Amino acid sequence: MDEVDKIIMHQLHQVDAAIEPTEELSGFTPEQVVRAVSGCLAEISPDLQLPRTLPGGAMAQRFGVASSLAQGCKDSGYRGDIGYQTFLYPNAVELRRLLMFLIEQLPRERQSAEDGASKSQTLSHRQLLERKIRKELAQQLKTPWVPQFARSVGNRKLLGCSSLGIEFRPNINLNIPSANPEERSKEQQQYLDQQAPNLFQQTASSSADLIASVLHKNELDRWDQTLSDSTLLFVDSEEPAPPPISTVKPDASAEEEASPIQELSDQVEELRVQCETLLAERKAHAVAIAALKQRETKASEEISRIQPTLKLHERTSLVLADSEENLTKLEALLKSTQSKRITLTQQWQDYRKPLLESLEKLKTAKEAQEVQGIRNNIEQLEQELLAKTQQHNELNATLRNASQSLAPRKEYTRRIHEFIGNIRKQRADIYKVLDDTRQLQKQLNVVGAQLQRQFNYTDDLLFQSAKHDLHAKRAYKLLAQLHANCNELVECVSLTGNVTKQIRELEVQIDGEKLKNVLTSLQQITGDIQKFEQHIQELQEQIRTVEQPNAGS
């Protein structure tokens, strides 16, 4: 089973790089078993939240972790005998069967990706982080969306919004009718019942908060403060609010109620007309200002374009005013400029010659320096090439040793095919033995039937002859004794076969129990029981220490 254990170790190392490989599964500790099984279950079912490590100390926590992993394996479809003892007291046979099942249940996409990648290369921290991010995003995409106001505190923390930011801005023009219906007329009551918006509608149409608006209205009613007309106009222009409802006494008439409302309506209409007039005038002035600005821009561009030509014409007119004198001045200026140019050319040649010589020297020095640098680089590259060649030879030697010590994948595949061929051959041999056994059983049945018929026929003949002949009577007794002895022999042979079969079954069970390391498991169970007893004694001492002060008081 060494090759099977190596294959299992290789697959587990691909699942979780933190699992330290061992030579055989019998050397697996409970902590390694828990980490390997939890890693495989996490790959099979990413939604499962299983512990990755086995806690130390408290046995109750260890039993809980082992039981949860056993339940996860059962949910994944494992039909074998599994429980907390499989993880706390592992044996090689059951552990091998469990890990082979989990490796077969791994996703095919992951296995194909691993086959294409290098098996000896472990995942980097960046790849592990990307895998974790993909799992988190997949888990968040599977969760249903819940609005923020319907989330509990725990759910908010899970979904990344531990608090809600609400702007408590009041609606200062909130309209709340009085609680006494006798103070309102029939028309006002009808308006409030059918047309007036309620508190929720007044605050829902804007960014104002309901609680803040009600508190603000209560403060206004408490201190009997009224808003000015300018404030009301500002609020009306910012966000529309329902018209205020004036409360009147029951003894007022309908004409007195309508007069202030009509006056306010007329004032509002006049202000609206004035506002529209001012807006129209403002638009007309804005159009005129835009046209003037455009004309100003065009004029500035035209002036900028004409200004150089104007300066040129001014200079030309100044020169043409006294042409002979200006021509003489220009000739003198031209001669002085030529002599100055010749002088400057000579000075430049005197200054340029040493500079050219120094430039040639610098170029030569730079080329020599570059050649020296190239030679140094060549020497350095040769040294690196020698080092790389030596390292390549060392790695080749290591690869040869590794290939000699560890069988490659093809060798594993070849051995697996050999195992399968041997199993098929054994199965064919078993079928052949079963066929031979059936044929032999048929022959035995035929021979037994023939013997039974011959015995019955002989028994009848001897029985008829025994009535008249003494020798026939003695032969009949010997025949009966022979038949009884033959039956005893057949029973003895059957009992011998059953005993041999039971002996073989017991030998197989003994071999299986030897592989389970019963003695080691019993020692671990004894140690765990002692830890439980020690923990119980500590709890009893704590209870006594708590009860003694209470008894003294």
Curated annotation (Swiss-Prot):
Q: Name one GO molecular function term.
A: cullin family protein binding
Q: Does the keyword Coiled coil apply?
A: yes
> GO annotations under biological process?
positive regulation of ubiquitin-dependent protein catabolic process
Enumerate the Pfam families for this protein: CCDC22_CC, CCDC22_N
Q: Which domain of life is it from?
A: Eukaryota
Q: Which InterPro entries match?
A: CCDC22 (IPR008530), CCDC22_CC (IPR048348), CCDC22_N (IPR048349)
Residue ranges of region Disordered? 236-264
Could you tell me the keywords of this UniProt record? Coiled coil
The residues forming a coiled coil are 261-286, 314-407, 498-549
Among PANTHER family, the record links this protein to:
COILED-COIL DOMAIN-CONTAINING PROTEIN 22, JM1 PROTEIN
Which family does the entry's similarity section mention? Belongs to the CCDC22 family.
**Protein name in UniProt:** Coiled-coil domain-containing protein 22 homolog
